[in-house]
Amino acid sequence: MPIKYWALQFKVISNEFLHINEVVAKASKRLHILRVLKRGGEPPADLLKVYFALIRSVLEYCCAVWHNALPVKLSDSIERVQKRTLRIIFLALHYQEALATTGCVPLHTRRMELCSKLFTKIKEPESRLRHLVPPTQLQAHGRSLRNKDRPSLISCKTERFKQSFLPAMCLYAHGM
């Protein structure tokens, strides 16, 4: 039985992300707009703006919630949409060349940057969510250690919780 929460849909029984499949399907439908604009003779710069506004925004919606727990197979299916987009815009270029030409990064890297940016905002003292972040090692132990500004690690009993946003970002802050 699927549970719908903030327009994200998770299938509880099989641990499959239905939301990702829906997002990929929705973004794939929007690729038709790019094809029509390409046939109409729009320049690549305008096609990229359309991609950023209509397609990539759909692919990255609420990515902080699901990015760390995303299996490689589903991450690749999201990345495939960007590959198809860049193939439509730049017919003659391979994916890596198209990324270099546009200045884009792979979506996995971009999602990780967005998660890190959100975690940094949450750690700020004026953030309303600051109480969710574990104390820094200096606050927890009172000792001036080498890594005193890093948040303490959250003890996790299950892998599922370990892959959720806050524990995963604390591990990422420690370079693990």
Regions found by a protein language model. Give the residues of each.
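Hydrophobic/basic alpha-helical segments
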Residues: 1-176
